[in-house]
Regions:
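Peripheral, non-AAA+ core regions of ATP-driven protein-machinery
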Residues: 3-167
Length: 167
């Protein structure tokens, strides 16, 4: 779609539950599960404390504006970035937008609606946008004058996303 979504995540003592709220569809919920599994498999590379016992914490992912239904794989890299930020306490840069599907191995896959998403990012004042390298062909369809103030980053792996997005 053509609107910016914000992703919030929190950690609390609990029993290892993953809660996902914000009127999300099945595919978007699956993206959250994939993101958490990726973190559990790659915690060392991500700089996450190996002592974390996930069974003693509840993780809550929320996408505000719950009245609006949301679905699709496009928020995968954003959900994963939010969770890595939560576990490492590294802040996500301001004025950065991202979209892309993730795999369990951390690959970033292309998504649809790129033109609409970039126009929404521009309206929201974003200065940087992270996309799958396969979506670059969709960016060239947008008039250069309109997006000249946005820096685009084309990635293949989640490690690249995290390097670009986290302070």
């Amino acid at each position: 779609g053509g609107e910016i979504l914000f992703i919030e995540s929190s950690l609390s003592e609990g029993k290892g539950n993953l809660s996902i709220t914000g009127n999300l569809g099945k595919i978007m919920k699956e993206s959250a599960v994939i993101a958490l599994e990726y973190i559990k498999s790659n915690y060392q590379d991500l700089g996450i404390n190996k002592e974390i016992d996930y069974s003693k914490y509840n993780i809550h992912i929320h996408v505000p504006e719950g009245a609006t239904p949301k679905d699709g794989p496009s928020a995968g890299i954003t959900i994963l970035t939010s969770l890595v930020s939560l576990f490492t306490q590294k802040r996500v840069k301001k004025n950065i937008a991202m979209t892309g599907e993730i795999t369990l191995r951390g690959k970033v896959l292309p998504v649809g609606g790129i033109k609409e998403k970039i126009l929404a990012a521009k309206r929201a004042g974003m200065k940087e946008v992270i996309l799958c390298h396969e979506n670059e062909k969709h960016v060239v369809e947008i008039p250069t004058d309109y997006i000249k103030d946005i820096q685009f980053h084309y990635v293949r792996e989640m490690s690249e996303v995290l390097q670009l997005a986290l302070n």
